[in-house]
Amino acid sequence: MMELQELYKKTITPALQKEFGFKSVMAVPRLEKITLNMGLGEAVADKKVIERAMDDMIKISGQKPLITYARKSEAGFKIRAGWPIGCKVTLRRDRMYEFLKRLISIAIPRIRDFRGLSPKSFDGRGNYSLGIREQIVFPEIQYDKVDAIRGMDITITTTARTDEEGRALLKAFGFPLKDESR
C-alpha cells in the first residue's frame, strides 16, 4: 500500500526538485486528491440505478460515494432540481495511492484498444482528467454480475502550478501518457 508513497518520497521528489530547480522539497508537486464521478442520466427513469452504481463505486474505491443532485430543472433532459443524477467519491492519502496503483497497473491496461492516455487532458494547472467508458476494467467488478456498463470520470488533482510539472509528476508515477509528437 505504501509503495507509491515511498517511490514519491525517495525517488520522484529529488528527481523533480532537480529537474525544475525547486529550492524546497515542499515546492515539489504532489498528488492532492483523486475524484471519481459517475453521471447517471438513466437514474431519472429508474431510481435503483443509483444504488447499483453506488455499489460499483464502493467496490472500486473502497469508500462510500456521495450522491450528486441536479441543481436546476432541465426540461430537455427530463430532470427536476433536487433529483439524484450521479455519485462521486474523493480519495485522499492512503486510499488515493492504493487506487492510483490499481489504476496504473491493472485498470488502464485492461481498456479496450488502449494506446496511451491523451497528454492534452491537463487543465492548465497540472490537474489531469480522464474518462473510462466501462467500469468492468477494474478487477473488483465481476463481469457476470454487472447489470449495465457505466463509465466514469477520474480527475487527478495535483499541487503542480503548470501542466509540465503535472505531466512530469504523473510520468514519474508510471502514467502511460502518449508522446506529444504524435
Swiss-Prot record:
GO molecular function, one term: rRNA binding
GO cellular component, one term: ribosome
PROSITE patterns: RIBOSOMAL_L5
InterPro entries referenced in this protein's UniProt entry, alphabetically: Ribosomal_uL5, Ribosomal_uL5_bac-type, Ribosomal_uL5_C, Ribosomal_uL5_CS, Ribosomal_uL5_dom_sf, Ribosomal_uL5_N
UniProt keywords, alphabetically: Ribonucleoprotein, Ribosomal protein, RNA-binding, rRNA-binding, tRNA-binding
GO annotation, biological process: translation
The protein's role, per its UniProt record: This is one of the proteins that bind and probably mediate the attachment of the 5S RNA into the large ribosomal subunit, where it forms part of the central protuberance. In the 70S ribosome it contacts protein S13 of the 30S subunit (bridge B1b), connecting the 2 subunits; this bridge is implicated in subunit movement. Contacts the P site tRNA; the 5S rRNA and some of its associated proteins might help stabilize positioning of ribosome-bound tRNAs.
Family affiliation: Belongs to the universal ribosomal protein uL5 family.
SUBUNIT field: Part of the 50S ribosomal subunit; part of the 5S rRNA/L5/L18/L25 subcomplex. Contacts the 5S rRNA and the P site tRNA. Forms a bridge to the 30S subunit in the 70S ribosome.
Protein name, as recorded: Large ribosomal subunit protein uL5
